[in-house]
């Protein structure tokens, strides 16, 4: 997931420097909100992550607090949000992530969405990060196949 650590680092450092915010990273996305898994992030915690692959917080693509095994656990997630003292949620992901994140706004949790998808299918975005990476990998694979086919 190229770019995720860059976003985490940028958001963390910007919030600390501009407003003196206390930043909390939720591990494994919405699953971490359900499982109550988080960690504090500061400039030191994100200092060397730009060149690391993946993401320091981990990812999870299938968790939905509004339908966790058919049960809406969003009230428990919001209780955890209040315990952590979160003022906002920065969600990094594609259309699924954004549609889930958007449902927290009426519950009192402002959301900032960072578009990340290889599909490049999010409204109001020209190009999402993840898309260029996918195109580059496909182009490289096609070039290798062409060489092999000769």
Language-model segments: residues:
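Acidic, glycine-rich active-site loops and adjacent beta-strand->loop/helix elements
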Residues: 27-33, 61-63, 94-97, 117-120
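Glycine-rich oxoanion-binding loops at beta->alpha junctions
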Residues: 33-91, 127-143
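N-terminal phosphate-binding or glycine-rich loops at protein starts, especially the Walker A/P-loop
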Residues: 1-37
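Short glycine-/acidic-enriched loop or helix-start segments at secondary-structure transitions
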Residues: 35, 100-102, 123
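General beta-strand structural signal in soluble alpha/beta enzymes
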Residues: 23-27, 57-59, 88-92, 112-114
């Amino acid at each position: 997931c190229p770019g995720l650590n860059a976003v985490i680092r940028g958001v963390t450092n910007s919030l600390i420097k501009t407003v003196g915010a206390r930043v909390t990273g939720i591990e494994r996305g919405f699953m971490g909100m359900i499982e109550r898994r988080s960690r504090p992030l500061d400039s030191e915690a994100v200092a060397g992550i730009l060149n690391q692959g993946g993401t320091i917080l981990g990812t999870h693509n299938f968790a939905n607090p509004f339908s966790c095994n058919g049960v809406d656990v969003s009230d428990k997630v919001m209780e955890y949000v209040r315990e952590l003292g979160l003022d906002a949620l920065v969600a990094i992901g594609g259309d699924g992530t954004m549609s889930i994140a958007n449902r927290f706004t009426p519950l009192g949790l402002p959301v900032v969405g960072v578009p990340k998808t290889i599909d490049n299918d999010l409204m109001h975005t020209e190009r999402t990060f993840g898309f260029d990476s996918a195109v580059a990998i496909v182009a490289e694979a096609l070039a290798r196949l062409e060489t092999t086919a000769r």
